[in-house]
């Protein structure tokens, strides 16, 4: 696979992932309010689950070509999940004196993202009889 093809594959996936993250943020504010940055939390959970599924498919060499691996794992899951947004939102909460809210935000993002990635791995192994 050429460098240009790799960049294009990642770019396509990243465009989709970032767009999804943007709209998840908008929709989460409409339905869940602004108590916590739910859009970042939801995006991180979904992206971590997708990454968990994809990593099994890549490691077990099932049906992902290099093009799709780059597009889905690096591009889509990488741009859907967002450590930078989690960091900035948490720093803003801390700066505003909302210490417990910041702690809840950090713990929820880390714990639920790890849980989602684990569920992605386990469910994919189960579905493909790899467990």
PLM segments and residue spans:
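Membrane-interface helix-loop junctions in multi-pass transporters/channels
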Residues: 1-131
